[in-house]
């Protein structure tokens, strides 16, 4: 799948789940389950409840996503 097929949205981390999964509320009000991207995991970027994040969603399953950026 090409990278431009993904949908990027802003959201807030609501809850931390096991296995580096997070429950994220998007700007439009939807709640999705998201995991950390490989580069964030490699660089030990910590994500806490309440952080503003950028989530990449695939058009095939809009209930799951990947956290690609944590805002300060």
From Swiss-Prot:
Report if keyword Protein biosynthesis is assigned: yes
What HAMAP family does the entry give? IF_1 (MF_00075)
Q: What is the lineage of its organism?
A: Bacteria, Pseudomonadati, Pseudomonadota, Gammaproteobacteria, Enterobacterales
Q: CDD domains, from UniProt?
A: S1_IF1
| Family to which this protein belongs | Belongs to the IF-1 family.
User: Record's InterPro entries?
Assistant: NA-bd_OB-fold, RNA-binding_domain_S1_IF1, S1_domain, TIF_IF1
Protein name, UniProt field: Translation initiation factor IF-1
Q: How does it assemble?
A: Component of the 30S ribosomal translation pre-initiation complex which assembles on the 30S ribosome in the order IF-2 and IF-3, IF-1 and N-formylmethionyl-tRNA(fMet); mRNA recruitment can occur at any time during PIC assembly.
- Name the PROSITE patterns for this protein: S1_IF1_TYPE
């Amino acid at each position: 799948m090409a990278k431009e097929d993904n949908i990027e949205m802003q959201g807030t981390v609501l809850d931390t789940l096991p296995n580096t999964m997070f429950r994220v509320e998007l700007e439009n009000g939807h709640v999705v389950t998201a995991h950390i991207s490989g580069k964030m995991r490699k660089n030990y970027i910590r994500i806490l409840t309440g952080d503003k994040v950028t989530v990449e969603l695939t058009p095939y399953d809009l209930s799951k996503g990947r956290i690609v950026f944590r805002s300060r």
